[in-house]
Regions:
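Aromatic-glycine hotspot motif
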Residues: 1-195
């Protein structure tokens, strides 16, 4: 359901990367369904002063995914120069599995939002959705560009937590879990809105 990377549509991918692309498609569709039929006031409605609106949940994901994808792209470019091959399926280590699990919905604990991920309030659902899908399209392009690399061996510095380094493969799984976490949060806002 990508909005448009034609190059991406014509190339086959390993199963693990195809699964991530399929998840991005499902996430895009979930986001579309969440905002469809909501007025701008409903997209920006917050159940409490400290809670996020549906729009803020999606804007946060778009911002975080975009910043993270940019950091991943830098690591992949460097790996392409150094030719870290052959490719192996994504296999996070114990820390990677733990980190992915911490991101999953429903949240087990609240996490502090990095400055770059604090969403603006009062945007239209259409504008938020466009930015969200554009961030996913950037990620789709990156996945295709990295399809021949061993994503377990390419490490990068997390742009939000500078001391944290982990593999590009783990980061792709973290992005999916983080997206599910905040889509779950947005659904909870919709449920609260109907009460």
């Amino acid at each position: 359901m990508s909005t448009g990377n034609p190059k991406a549509l014509n190339q086959s991918l390993p199963d693990d990367l195809q699964s991530i692309l399929n998840e991005l498609d499902r996430t895009d569709e979930d986001a579309r369904q969440l905002v469809s039929g909501l007025s701008e006031a409903q997209v920006n409605w917050r159940p409490s002063p400290t809670a996020w609106s549906v729009g803020q949940c999606l804007a946060h994901l778009g911002q975080m995914d975009s910043v993270l994808t940019s950091a991943l792209r830098t690591a992949v470019r460097q790996a392409n120069k150094n030719s870290l091959m052959p490719r192996k399926p994504i296999q996070p280590g114990w820390f990677g599995r733990w980190f992915v699990n911490q991101m999953e919905a429903p949240p087990r604990r609240k996490m502090k939002t990095p400055r770059q991920g604090i969403p603006e309030a009062h945007k239209s659902g259409e504008e938020i959705l466009r930015a969200f899908i554009a961030a996913h399209d950037e990620l789709r392009s990156l996945i295709h560009d990295a399809r021949d690399l061993d994503l377990n061996r390419i490490r990068f510095r997390n742009p939000f937590i500078g001391l944290l380094r982990y593999s590009v493969g783990t980061a792709l799984l973290v992005i999916g879990a983080h997206d599910r976490r905040h889509l779950w949060q947005a659904r909870q806002v919709c449920i609260a809105m109907k009460r």
